[in-house]
Amino acid sequence: MGVSPVAQLFHDSGEPKSALRIRPKYLTCSVSGVQVTPKPQMIIITRRILLTFLAALSTLFITILRADVQLPKVIDSHMVLQRDVPLPVWGWAEAGEEVTVKLDENQATAKTDDKGNWKVTLKPMKADGKAHQMTVSGKNKIVLKDILIGEVWVGSGQSNMEWRLSNTHGGKEAVATANHKEIRLFHVPKVQAKAPAKDVKAAWKVCASGPAAVFSAVLYHFGNRIHKELNVPIGLINSSWGGSPIEPWTTAESGSGGMYNAMIAPLQPFAIRGVIWYQGETNVLRKNGLTYYDKMKALIDGWRESWGEDTSFYFVQIAPWAGRYQAGQLPALWEAQSASMKIPGTGMAVITDLVDDIRDIHPRKKIPVGNRLALWALSKDYEKNDIVYSGPHYKSSKVEGNKIRISFNFAGGGLKSRDGKPLNEFQIAGEDGKFVAAEAAIDRNEVVVQSKEVTAPSQVRFGWHKVCNPNLMNAEGLPASPFQTKDWKGWTGD
């Protein structure tokens, strides 16, 4: 590796560490064409003088760098900007410096504060399929190219969101065909911080087989479906970390905040349409099932403080797994996730039917996961009103003698059995709460549940254990969510 002139000047020559010596060859100079060389003795520079010199040099270097206008990495060439909303653009420069941002004819100017921070907001723009150029001018000029206007989504969570496209069912074919000039990918590296960071080490990339192969499979399939349906550019930001609980993703006010600080905060207030979230396995292992609703609400509320109250937030109900979940914890989390749908602007994709290996916590069928999340966005954000975007969810129950009749939301074109066999995974109980396996039959858009062992039923539950494989779905092929008809205040049982 090369040595800089300053480093070479003070290169260690084997002299005592209390002093650094400059050899005469560095002091040879020319006066009126005559070479003048001091006597061959060494000139000693004390460590204190050296450190003072280097500190001054470092301060000068940092000042020079800070004087230049700078942008966060999320604002760069090849990015996608969210259409139809005001567009924040921000960065850093010398204190008091005037900075102008121009995107085509869209222009705004701001002056930095005493800490060198600046921010402008450009007017909303329409998606037009054209590549745009942005200039950011202060004492220097930054030119960003190949900018598209379209839809921007963030994907976050733990390993099932992080899971690479190349390592999924159909991954080889998906990677081979992942050349989409109008889809752009931004992958945030895994790091934590004690306070909100200003930037991340990442870059926007045009979607092609190489970058897509190592990108989030769920987020890619979600974005690809949106792109196909809307025919507008799509920007996808993946910020996920395998094995992470929900708490580090939550703002420091309501959680530990380490991942939020380093992997979400630097992206804000970059304009987005919404977030998709796939997480919860670690919190089940931590026996947080019953408290997960409060954690989820805190996370959504915290992120919306910066991105806006109308930011959509769609999430995946985690899959059944035969692993180390304690009895009742997975159904408890499912109940908390279902309750989270009461938060405005949210929706849940159910995937109980996508498990090939009940021993694998990572279902490899990611295409339908992304597609089911996309159904929520297409219906709620893009007004595709003819889409059935969810499988059946429990609505109400009615006791009819020794039977209980269950009504559902999102029955779509009607209820059916996925495999053509009698409905499974239904249990029934009386007031004693002792559940037994039950017979269940479809009656129009309702299900009637009964058992010869329970003559005075009061409650039903469905898919209520960690290795369930229920077959109830709607005509559109979307599975019913596990549920219980009675809200228990404590232990949910198994």
Language-model features and meaning:
Residues 2-9:
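Extreme N-terminal basic, low-complexity initiation segments
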Residues 21-23, 47-48, 66:
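Basic polycationic patches enriched in arginine
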Residues 67-494:
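Cell-envelope and extracellular/periplasmic
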Residues 9, 16-18, 26, 40:
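Cationic, low-complexity basic patches in intrinsically disordered or flexible, solvent-exposed regions
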Residues 51-61:
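Bacterial N-terminal signal peptides
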